[in-house]
Amino acid sequence: TDAREIYEEGIRVPPLKIFKNDELQSDVLNLILHNSRMPTWNRSDFNALVAAMRTAEKRVIEMAERFGDDEYYSALDELLARNKRAMARLIKDTVPTKKQHFEDYICDDGLGMGPYRIKCSMWRDKDKVIFDFDGTDPQSISSINFYLNEEMFKMFCGVYMIMVFDPQIMFNDGFYDLMEVRIPEGTLLKPREPAALSCRTHALGRIFDVLGGLLGQGDPDFLAGAGFSDSPHFMYSGYDKNGEWYQLYSIGFGGIPGKPSGDGPDGHSL
């Protein structure tokens, strides 16, 4: 988009409770639905999410009643501890103490400005891995910025490392305190308010490429080419023969990058 501030990109809804004491807060839901072109679809999605959460709640209660609270919470703690132990070994085996560097670029922001550099350094300090984005370009006046939450980046790293190096590791957030993420304020990945953010997914794709470039340096067998990164978004809308508004939205994903074992598959999600 050509937005220069986040206020130009739509209504900002802060975290709100849609249910309080198991009672739906209709005014909150209606506020969201009234800002949607397809409120019926969105209400259906919302109802599906609520049904899934109620099922999960029921299953947790069943486990706690069957095994007792102490056993249930002890099991949760053990799952977190098991993940942390496995990730600690993985970090020690795959991340060197010497700094590794990798950078990639967003070629253009859609308004003719760019390229924008995303740079990251990675190294191990005792049992902790450090990711430092110092050297990343300053925030843009366009909407290409991506406010990267440090905890979210840890999740990205954990999924990547487990899937690439040891898929047998059970995934949860037990390893989070084994990672430290440093993102300088005022950069493309931590812009100051009121920076526009609506085209942030272009930076997200580059972050995965940077992560792959960093981890692949330590083990060339897992080094892969760059991914497709940018995704075209297709919107189809209009009025059907009954005069009802319709809207279809599709994201076109590209191919998976090649690696030492062979070529990656072509476009896989069109």
What spans do the regions from the language model cover?
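Glycine/proline-enriched, intrinsically flexible loops and inter-domain linkers
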Residues: 1-270
